[in-house]
Amino acid sequence: MYTKQSSAKIQELKSPALSIKIGYLDDDFRIFSLVSEEEREFQPHYHSFHKLLFFESGNVSYYVEGETYELQPFDLVLVPAGEVHRPVIHSSLPYRRLILYLSPAFFEAYKKESVDLFHSFSLCSARASHVLRFSDLLESRLYTPLQELSQ
């Protein structure tokens, strides 16, 4: 649950001295599945690329830029490049997710006057909501093709 106290803690974590840049991306995109089966603490961090995370299972909160989201299966988390984020795993249940990294150059290469693939990421900051909630896999038409690509 998001509280003023957790907001203050997140603002503290967003300090450049306390958040680190991690990960790298040598191509336009990278897609993979991850499972964390033990409790693990993730440090606040950011990337130079955009991150799309499909949450599959676990008991996880996700912090992005001062907001806390209690994830539910099939949630889609959008994290634009440069935004501080981290998951918090609340139990030893396996934390399963499908991750897609996208370079800023990827979006630029496909940008046209009538089409802006980056639009969904742009809305995150404007609406202060980084999670799209789907009730099932059928509602999320992106999940199945991405899962197939990750194998």
Where are each of the predicted segments found?
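N-terminal regulatory/effector-sensing and dimerization cores
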Residues: D28-L123
